[in-house]
Design a protein with these regions (language model features):
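Conserved glycine-rich cofactor-binding loop
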Residues: 12-13
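Active-site helix of classical SDR
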Residues: 119, 156, 164
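Alpha-helical segment proximal to the catalytic Tyr-Lys
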Residues: 124, 169-173, 233
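Residue(s) in the substrate-gating loop at a strand-loop-helix junction
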Residues: 140
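C-terminal substrate-recognition "lid" of short-chain dehydrogenase/reductases
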Residues: 213-242, 247-248
Length: 249
């Protein structure tokens, strides 16, 4: 089985770490390049356990020139990049009245522009090499639904989904696939603090979710793994929701 080279951003914890670990564990042909703003003990364990199959770069994704150089280095070392899971992002929780335009710019710069930068670089590289590429953006149900105090995050995710749809149509003939995976509330690294510090809001999210619980990072990783796999050969320009039924209401 030939190597499949993939990038996972925001790989240090939560959904990003669960995806990285699953891809390494499930298929020996997967070579994963992790990009995250910081390292940790869990990533060190992956480096020890998987050796050359896991390579880590420390970078914020909004360091756009640095990320471009990383992608070039990966391609020079491994060859063409087959897939990318763009998971890294930030959120802010402020009402619209208290969210100035600079905050909107900051969130959009990380969640939207930085991911467009990665996608454009991969598309251009693979067009040059006449190779397909599968790009998956981790979005959010917030991009499609209205939420109090999350307008900055919502704008960034809905804009990212708009780019995804247009790029998917534009490059489908070149065997480029672009999709979004939009989780609901997930038990990632912030979950315990959220339950403790925002109990009323946590209870509300449970009441809004038909399945009556938050999702698990591993559940999102399962879907992401399929969406960038060779088994997924006909899906592009689509947002898949994994939210316990929230958006079905």
């Amino acid at each position: 089985m030939s190597k499949r080279i993939g990038i996972v951003t925001g790989c240090g914890r939560g959904i990003g770490f669960a995806i990285t670990e699953k891809l390494l564990l499930e298929n020996e042909s997967n070579y994963i390049i992790g990009i995250s703003r910081s390292s940790n003990n869990e990533l060190d364990k992956l480096k020890k356990e998987y050796g050359q199959r896991f390579r880590f770069y420390k970078s914020n994704i909004n360091q756009t020139e640095k990320v471009i150089k990383i992608i070039d280095e990966i391609q020079e070392y491994y060859g063409s990049i087959n897939f990318a899971i763009c998971n890294a992002g930030i959120r802010s929780r402020l009402c619209i009245e208290d969210s100035d335009l600079d905050l909107y710019r900051q969130v959009i710069e990380v969640n939207t522009i930085s991911n467009i930068n990665i996608a454009k670089k991969l598309i251009l590289n693979n067009l040059k090499n006449q190779m397909p590429c599968n790009i998956l953006f981790i979005s959010s149900i917030v991009g499609a639904r209205g939420f109090d105090e999350l307008s900055t995050y919502a704008v960034s995710k809905s804009a990212l989904e708009g780019f995804m749809k247009s790029a998917a149509v534009e490059y489908a003939k070149n065997k480029m696939q672009l999709n979004c995976l939009a989780p609901g509330f997930i038990e990632s690294s912030y979950a315990e603090d959220f339950k403790r510090e925002k109990k009323d809001l946590y209870d509300w999210t449970i009441a809004q979710t038909p399945m009556g619980r938050w999702g698990k990072c591993e559940e999102i990783a399962e879907i992401a793994s399929f969406m960038i796999s060779e088994k997924n050969s006909y899906m592009t320009g689509t947002t898949i929701y994994s939210d316990g039924g929230w958006t079905a209401k």
